[in-house]
Amino acid sequence: MPLNVSFTNRNYDLDYDSVQPYFYCDEEENFYQQQQQSELQPPAPSEDIWKKFELLPTPPLSPSRRSGLCSPSYVAVTPFSPRGDNDGGGGSFSTADQLEMVTELLGGDMVNQSFICDPDDETFIKNIIIQDCMWSGFSAAAKLVSEKLASYQAARKDSSSPNPARGHSVCSTSSLYLQDLSAAASECIDPSVVFPYPLNDSSSPKSCASPDSSAFSPSSDSLLSSTESSPQASPEPLVLHEETPPTTSSDSEEEQEDEEEIDVVSVEKRQAPSKRSESGSPSAGGHSKPPHSPLVLKRCHVSTHQHNYAAPPSTRKDYPAAKRVKLDSVRVLRQISNNRKCTSPRSSDTEENDKRRTHNVLERQRRNELKRSFFALRDQIPELENNEKAPKVVILKKATAYILSVQGEEQKLTSEKDLLRKRREQLKHKLEQLRNSCA
């Protein structure tokens, strides 16, 4: 497809003037002059931090591989013309040449933003401010691009033709160019992966579009809105240039599908809590289903009681067989209940410590009372009254023998008492008879 392009004859040695703001020279401002003046005073911590993250900007593009093409900063692009049109000079270019020229024109992020955004608009200033601090030299590059953009628009205004029939013919003959350009642009990297922040925050319809939707898409609507918002743009009819190829319905549908997919994902993520809250609040007549909580595995604390074999044998208590079986069953049931309760290790440890402390206090009280009872029983036995080291078994045996002897003496005394009562009754009856005989 032919393209009418007017080139400015310049030497490649002079291209350094156009990209000079991208480099740092030794004559520029030294931010650490205070440190050079006084070596004893160290720099501030903030200066060290910014010095560590100071990076050079992306180097400029290489010169064109074609000898006839010069730097994209000095290319004035004219509208398309079909083959055989004599209105503009220049020859015809192949698809590879056209893609190379478009790549040079749309190669950098700064140039893309300057094509879409007006350099005098507040959104372009916000784009400069929103960039990270490590992108040094950004403002100088933006200034250079804005100046070159003014020259582009002036050259385009002078070289464009107001013939509407020619614009219609350009629209009809540029479909093949659009297919080649869309095929080449499909291999581009999504700028949202590199820079996830939006280009602007304004909601005006004439502002810049987001980088993932229209910064790299060959859409004529976004470029038309940017040219209308720019004060330097001319009120000429829509004429397609090299940097604004026409769009077809298939491309617009693909872009719309991409935007809809992104919107669906974001809406699904944002509306998930609201849907969950709506499902959590059922109607008044229905039964509410509790929300499904994630499964959390918790460790169960198993209480293990070890016997203290170093304790003296005197502290043990001989329980009866029935009582011992009952206590063992109760202990087993407690262990089973403790195993069923799966709580956090810290809470289970604290509960076990409290239970063990309470159990120790009660056990100590019980042992003290038992010891006092044994001491009292020992004092009642005449044989062991003064024996403080008498074992519990001897105390129990002597106490049993003493009780049996006391019971025998009790029976003897009871029988003697009965005999004495009977004799008293007899003596009393005899006394009554003597009184009656004397009277």
From Swiss-Prot:
InterPro entries: bHLH_dom, HLH_DNA-bd_sf, Myc-LZ, Myc_transcription_factors, Tscrpt_reg_Myc, Tscrpt_reg_Myc_N. GO terms for molecular function: DNA binding; DNA-binding transcription factor activity, RNA polymerase II-specific; E-box binding; protein dimerization activity; protein-containing complex binding. It holds the Pfam family HLH. Residues 251-263 have a biased composition (Acidic residues). Residues 201-295, 334-364 are annotated as: Disordered. Keywords: Acetylation, Activator, Chromosome, Cytoplasm, DNA-binding, Glycoprotein, Isopeptide bond, Nucleus, Phosphoprotein, Proto-oncogene, Transcription, Transcription regulation, Ubl conjugation. One of its GO terms (cellular component) is nucleolus. One of its GO terms (biological process) is chromatin remodeling. A motif (9aaTAD) lies at residues 100-108. Residues 335-347 have a biased composition (Polar residues). There is a cross-link at K52, K143, K148, K298 (Glycyl lysine isopeptide (Lys-Gly) (interchain with G-Cter in SUMO2)). Gene3D superfamilies: Helix-loop-helix DNA-binding domain. It is found in: Nucleus, Nucleoplasm; Nucleus, Nucleolus; Nucleus; Cytoplasm. The modification Phosphothreonine is found at T8, T58, T315. Efficient DNA binding requires dimerization with another bHLH protein. Binds DNA as a heterodimer with MAX. Interacts with TAF1C and SPAG9. Interacts with PARP10. Interacts with KDM5A and KDM5B. Interacts (when phosphorylated at Thr-58 and Ser-62) with FBXW7. Interacts with PIM2. Interacts with RIOX1. The heterodimer MYC:MAX interacts with ABI1; the interaction may enhance MYC:MAX transcriptional activity. Interacts with TRIM6. Interacts with NPM1; the binary complex is recruited to the promoter of MYC target genes and enhances their transcription. The 9aaTAD motif is a transactivation domain present in a large number of yeast and animal transcription factors. Transcription factor that binds DNA in a non-specific manner, yet also specifically recognizes the core sequence 5'-CAC[GA]TG-3'. Activates the transcription of growth-related genes. Binds to the VEGFA promoter, promoting VEGFA production and subsequent sprouting angiogenesis. Regulator of somatic reprogramming, controls self-renewal of embryonic stem cells. Functions with TAF6L to activate target gene expression through RNA polymerase II pause release. This is Myc proto-oncogene protein. It comes from Hylobates lar.
